[in-house]
Amino acid sequence: MATDAHKETLEFQAEVQQLLHLMIHSLYSNKDIFLRELISNASDAIDKLRFQSLQDESLLEGEGDLRIRVSVDKDARTITVADNGIGMTRDEVAENLGTIARSGTKAFLDQLTGDQQKDAKLIGQFGVGFYSAFVVAEHVTVHTRKAGLGAEHGVRWSSDGKGAYTLENEEVAERGTRVVLTLPESQSEYLDDWRLKGIIRRYSDHIDVPIQMPAQAEDKDEPEDEAEKAEAAETWETVNNTNALWMRPKSEISDDDYKAFYKHVAHDFDDPMVWLHNHVEGRQSYTSLLYIPKNPPFDLYEREPAHGIKLYVRRVFIMEDTEKLMPRYLRFVRGLVDSDDLPLNVSRELLQHNPLLDKIRSASVKRILDRLEKMAKNEPEQYAEFYGNFGKVLKEGVAEDFANRERIAKLLRFSTTQDENETPDVSLDDYIARMKEGQEAIYYVTAESFNAARNSPHLEVFRKKGVEVLLLPDPVDEWVITHLNEYDGKPLKSVAKGGLDLGELEDQAEKKAAEEATESHKDLLEKLKGALEDKVSEVRVSTRLTDSPACLVVGEYDFGMGMQRLLKAAGHAMPQGKPALEINIDHPIVQRMDTGLDDARFSDWAAVLYDQALLTEGGQLEDPAAFVKRVNALLTEQARAGEAKSNAARGD
């Protein structure tokens, strides 16, 4: 294999420069995090070597004693973090250290507020990894060699974090990666061994890799000659607890231990909300340690997040994959599963259809849902906090997990017309418990915002009758709710779809009046249909409206208008269906249209009637300028009529 030996100086990706600047100025109170991140990277490199060496033992190069070493040189003002893991090639160094290989980078930068404390917390959630070294270092050098390659394939990367880095080949005798941080005078506190040991024990104590530092012989004098110094330098002591936390009995693990391990595995500053630790023995043996975070991970709304549940086989890290161990609607869960029954050389292809993994996944989902049900029942305030952070993701389970659909639906929370609280806090059980006598269905309305939902004209008759309606303002709500046809034997019905059927709540006198109005205003309905024939499927007298002049209603089995717009924007072909226009026959605007307007004016009034109904649905007008022109014309007409009336009253 040829070696690319030339030296090159390259510019950082633009987002990297911005991120480095933000970190240096925002992580002022959390600088310790740099060591946690570098150790976690080293641990990942060792995990990768362990896994790959199962297929190719030669990668160990005769050295199977895997470890991470942290050392300080006070004279040179350096901290070195070295591992004998998988190492990197030149291309991998350029890819991993010159760019941020994460799709959410731009979104992350957009979320920053300028508030140092808030931004520091967000940066910690994002997981800045290697770049956190520049929070304390004025210069960083990386020496690395990929396992299985010769010493001549070593790579040296160097940068001061100010916009550019150099990349060149060098001789590297040992496999692995060595990161050398040169510290300025202002960061001298980190040149103390005890300070670094404290950070390691706080953040990385439970890493399943020995973290070693030079032994401190407190009962001996300082070495005087070079031989004694060399001997002392070769003596290393392990400073972390290398026993895997999850393998210990729960009775021996303190809450602080669980919290510290969570911060390591999730790269989070905050404590978790809850955790579930289970040892399963029998036909299948495995251990799971699952955490529900207090705050949403940065990649929560990515359907294919980069981080999730880690899979270990007999304490050997195999892979990190959310969906194989946890469904996507629970992608906020962090933690691990360690199985005794999977083969160590298991392939990713085999994992896709592994019955044991399916059983572990099902059991893990059950435990999470059990814990959420318990929280919702016994700790409603904590559950409200959880739902505020993760409810939008949890509700996806209604559409994705048929086996647990009813359980997930029970955990959902909604805003309703009863108190119009924008914070969803009403369960379906709450709704059913206060349904009116004779009410047969659970009613809901979807919209593109909370205000649009609560002000929907479709709610008018329900408010008049005192019937509670669920308000669903999230874009995903309609997709979710179409998969929940009923709950506890009660059908779910949209107030904006199909014909209005209130069952026993329907006022027969009102229904009869609407039928009579349809007959007596037949000419108006036909004329409106003719004026709007390219936009509506029919025009009918409404039994929904009490205050508004008109509303649009789609078919009972059609997508709502908001969902149609979302699907169309996403590039999906939509059927060319048209909504129905329902009119309030008692409204002054509609009555005015029934008084012999000429064709041109009637056409303008009809267009305005349709456009305002479309706007209340969150729709976009095809020709806003034409709409404004028509409205201005109508207002001018009314103003002149009012002026003429005033003049007549004065006798002018």
Swiss-Prot record:
Subunit structure: Homodimer.
GO CC annotation terms, alphabetical: cytoplasm
A Pfam family that the UniProt record links to this protein: HATPase_c_3
Annotated family: Belongs to the heat shock protein 90 family.
Function per UniProt: Molecular chaperone. Has ATPase activity.
Organism this protein belongs to: Alkalilimnicola ehrlichii (strain ATCC BAA-1101 / DSM 17681 / MLHE-1)
Alphabetized InterPro entries for the sequence: HATPase_C_sf (IPR036890), Heat_shock_protein_90_CS (IPR019805), HSP90_C (IPR037196), Hsp90_fam (IPR001404), Hsp90_N (IPR020575), Ribosomal_Su5_D2-typ_SF (IPR020568)
Protein name: Chaperone protein HtpG
B, as annotated region: 349-565
UniProt-annotated stretches for the region C: 566-652
Top-level taxon of origin: Bacteria
Entry's Gene Ontology molecular function annotations: ATP binding; ATP hydrolysis activity; ATP-dependent protein folding chaperone; unfolded protein binding
Keyword entries, A-Z: ATP-binding, Chaperone, Cytoplasm, Nucleotide-binding, Stress response
Region (A): 1-348
Localisation per UniProt entry: Cytoplasm
Predominant cellular place of this UniProt entry's protein: cytoplasm
